[in-house]
């Protein structure tokens, strides 16, 4: 039909990560995507200096910021570091267990771990919670309190993973006809 059923689309531009080096280059990139119509920026990683500059410049321009903290970059900027630097929201949950570490900076993965294997990556990512502070512990409480004080938003993504576990039920969901893109409907 060509109709948009949602109230509106809020376009976010994807930050190119380590291709942008330095404070001024990051700010210049944010200004450029704002000029092209982006209302926000999504990040997957980059240098600490560039990430902080993106958060700051986006805020100055009234843009939103969201980050999928790539697992191979959270050792130097985890979700709490990003929240303190001005990030608005954390996508999925990557970077949160690392913010809850008390005895390490880098995640412990088995020596044979293959980051390129998505199912293995998801399994190991889930095990990161076993390396984090115990729920309810002092460190856990401090991290959660600080994130709340910073008005930091956590945006978990569970629906499609549930569909992977129960495709038959998800295939017949009543909202598909109205909301699922035709290309994605082929998955179901």
Feature-to-residue mapping (PLM):
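Alpha-helix-loop-beta-strand connector modules within alpha/beta enzyme cores
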Residues: 2-7, 11-12, 52-70
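Hydrophobic faces of well-ordered beta-strands that scaffold small-molecule active sites
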Residues: 9-13, 41-43, 65-67, 90-92, ...
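Active-site beta-loop-alpha junctions enriched in small/polar residues
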Residues: 14-17, 46, 70-74, 93-96, ...
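Short, acidic/polar
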Residues: 19-32, 73-81
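Aromatic/hydrophobic pocket-lining residues that form the small-molecule binding cavity
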Residues: 26, 51, 140
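Active-site neighborhoods of metal-dependent hydrolases
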Residues: 29-41, 96-188
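Generic structural signal for hydrophobic
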Residues: 32-33, 54, 58, 82-83, ...
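Glycine-enriched alpha-helix->loop->beta-strand junction motifs that scaffold or abut catalytic
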Residues: 37, 60-64, 84-90, 150-151
């Amino acid at each position: 039909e060509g109709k948009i059923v949602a109230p509106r689309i809020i376009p976010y531009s994807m930050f190119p990560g380590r291709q942008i080096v330095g404070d001024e280059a990051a700010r210049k990139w944010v200004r450029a995507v704002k000029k092209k119509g982006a209302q926000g920026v999504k990040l997957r990683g980059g240098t600490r200096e560039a990430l902080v500059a993106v958060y700051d410049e986006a805020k100055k321009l009234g843009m939103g910021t969201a980050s999928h903290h790539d697992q191979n970059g959270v050792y130097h900027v985890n979700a709490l570091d990003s929240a303190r630097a001005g990030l608005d929201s954390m996508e999925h949950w990557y970077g949160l267990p690392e913010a809850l570490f008390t005895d390490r900076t880098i995640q412990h993965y088995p020596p044979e771990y293959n980051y390129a294997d998505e199912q293995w990556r998801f399994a190991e990512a889930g095990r990161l919670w076993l390396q984090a502070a115990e729920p309810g512990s002092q460190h856990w409480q401090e991290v959660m309190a600080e994130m709340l004080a910073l008005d930091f938003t956590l945006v978990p993504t569970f629906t499609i993973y549930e569909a992977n576990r129960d495709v038959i039920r998800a295939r017949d969901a009543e909202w598909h006809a109205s909301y699922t893109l035709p290309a994605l409907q082929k998955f179901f």
